[in-house]
Each structure stands twice: as C-alpha cells, then as structure tokens.
C-alpha cells in the first residue's frame, strides 16, 4: 500500500545528494506524502541549504526539530528508538560531511547504524565517544569511500549486513575496493545499490528481510 504519512524525516547534512527533492516534498504535502516532523543536525552544523529547508518545512506545517549526540526519539506506537550518536556539539567543526548526523535505530533485536557521510575523523570521534555499539546492519558511511569503515570501527559495530548507496560508474569510484575488502573481512553481507538497485529492509523486531529492486 502507498505511504501517505511519514512520522520523521532526518536530513544528515546539506549535500545535494542527501537533500534533493526535499523542498518539493514539503511544499506538495497536500497532494503527496504528509511529513509530520523534520529532524536536522544541531544549529551550529546547519548550512544555508538545511536552514532553508527548515524554513520551508515550518511554512508548510511540518514540525522542525534539531537533535544532538545523546538525544533519542521514540515512536510511541512501537518500540522503535532512534538515538543520535553524533556529531558532538561544540567541536568547532562547522557544516559538512564530518558533521553528518549519525543515528542508531533499534527495534527489538533489530539495530541499524546510519552514518551519513562521516569518514575517518567522524568514525574515530564515534569510537572515542563511547556511544558506539553493536548494530547488525550498517549503512556504510560516505557511499563506501576509501576512508570509511575502518577496522577499529567495524570491530565495535560488528555488522552482519552492510548497505552501500552508490551510483553505477560514479565519478568518485565509490565504493572503494579497500573498503569492500574490510567489510568482507568483517563477515558482512554487502548490499550495494550498484548491484542490487533499490534496497528495502523490513523487520518485526526479531527477524530481518532484505528486498531489492532493479530495473
């Protein structure tokens, strides 16, 4: 059945490939999908693009909130909890990939780590924060770039499945062979959109189904 409403939409940072189409979705809610809450990084990490989308959301009746490391959101109808693991406030880092929202989603025995575009420094900050834990599913950081998925990071997260979002024959060479090798050595099943197309995960809190669609 068609999705008519989204409780929460999270924007990790302001890169175009992470926000494209968001303003249009917010402006066309009467005819499209209703978005109840838009969640943004802390204000110190908002660039003008994110701030502009926030203003568009507010004008169209969507509640706009920010989330920072250590804060959580819980869906009252289920046991789904989403915790912000980064970025920390007060780093002086400014907007960009390194300041991407990093979110840990847990629902019963299911857990997924969503990493935005953080790379080496961002992953190390997560390791040092003490907030990082084990997540069965990892959304690989920065499209599986060379500087993501360090061995230390993977030893803590211990993912069984890694989902990589990357276009076919993209000019950046994502995902990088070294990153794929580290994920394989960590025992991951790799689901890359290059090979699988659209990837959908379904969980009832105990089991996990992975579906893909490729034209």
Positions of PLM-derived features:
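Non-globular, low-confidence helical/coil segments that flank catalytic cores
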Residues: 1-215
């Amino acid at each position: 059945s068609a999705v008519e409403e989204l409780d929460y939409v999270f924007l990790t940072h302001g890169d175009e490939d992470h926000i494209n189409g968001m303003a249009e979705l917010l402006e066309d809610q009467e005819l499209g999908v209703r978005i109840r809450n838009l969640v943004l990084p802390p204000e110190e990490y908002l660039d003008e693009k994110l701030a502009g989308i926030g203003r568009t959301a507010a004008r169209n009746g969507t509640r706009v909130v920010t989330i920072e490391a250590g804060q959580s959101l819980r869906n009252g109808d289920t046991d789904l909890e989403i915790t912000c693991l980064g970025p920390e406030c007060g780093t002086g880092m400014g907007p960009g990939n390194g300041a991407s929202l990093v979110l840990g989603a847990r629902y019963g025995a299911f857990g997924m780590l969503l990493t935005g575009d953080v790379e080496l420094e961002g992953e190390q900050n997560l390791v040092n924060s003490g907030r990082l834990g084990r997540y069965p599913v990892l959304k690989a950081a920065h499209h599986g770039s060379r500087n993501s998925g360090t061995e230390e990071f993977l030893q803590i997260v211990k993912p069984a499945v890694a989902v990589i979002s990357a276009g076919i024959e993209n000019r950046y060479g994502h995902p990088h062979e070294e990153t794929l090798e580290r994920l394989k050595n960590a025992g991951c099943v790799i689901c890359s959109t290059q090979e699988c197309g659209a990837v959908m995960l379904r969980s009832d809190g105990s089991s996990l189904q992975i579906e893909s669609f490729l034209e």
